[in-house]
Amino acid sequence: MRFRVILGKADDLKADVLFQMSVPASAETPLALEGFLTGPTSTRASTLPVHQKIRIHSQRVVGEGTEILGHSILTEPAFWTPNVPMLYFVKCRITSSGKELALLSQTTGLRRLGIRNHSLWLDGHRFVLRGVTCSNRDYSSAEQQPAAPEDHRTADVLDLPAEVFSETDSVELEIDENLKTADEIGRPIIIRLHPKSPPSVIPSVICRLASHPSVFLTVIPNTLLPEVSKFSAYKGTMLFAKETHAKFAPPELPNGIDLAVVRLSQSVPDSSWKTPPPYPVIAWQTGVPSQRQECDRLQALLANWRTAPKGPPSSWDWAGYFVGDETIPHQA
């Protein structure tokens, strides 16, 4: 069953939360939904729990299945941030004439992530994304846990191998358990899809990734860019990025892509980047260690470049900084 959480109109007092469920079976009679939203829980904070009913907002036949849209209203909602990773638990049971068709139990988080001008904004504040490349790290082992509270804000950049994709709608990701742990500890995650990913399963993959509040950004390879408008509707508040190289002029982004990740093989970008593009840009320095302090070094280096003569306007700055080498090349 394909499932995704949609955060509607939300503020500190109230949040409209929608739950889209695609059941791979059509029924002669309308389906019934018994669902509840409970929480929040967090590894760093506590608050009074709620037990909110999920009601059917609408349902329709789509292809050979049925799509149900559930709805719940939360008062004084708790939103997910790296500092305070608040999580809710969703449990839904879908029946037809008393017969169970699908059962769902899943944790999720409500994350207010978006773009304002050239920056990322999280929960009403500018958020500079700093990340290091790594393999599919096992967060369940003690040695992989963050060494200090301030480290949880550093994102992991993960390459998603093509082997994790399935030709069925119930796509199982090898890193799913690690993403759940990242949700709990508040570590942002950047996902790079494999260039050989089959387009037919991408909507299910995007729904799966978007259900994890820790997954801030998914990098779409060039091979999937022609299809991006078809599956961008599934991403919710998760952002899509395109990779490019700093030796080329800033590209025009396809519809559905929110920002660019610019690869730096030299110390500074081409001079054409001193005229900022109309979208956020994250700088990625390869050939350096995958360490948090390298993000600071890159930020200082690019700050000098930015303030040099004929540099970008003082109101512009980079939206984030990645360091380290990738394991899956996206470009030749």
Model-predicted segments: where are they?
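Secreted/periplasmic carbohydrate-active enzymes, especially glycoside hydrolases
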Residues: 1-191, 199-258, 263-332
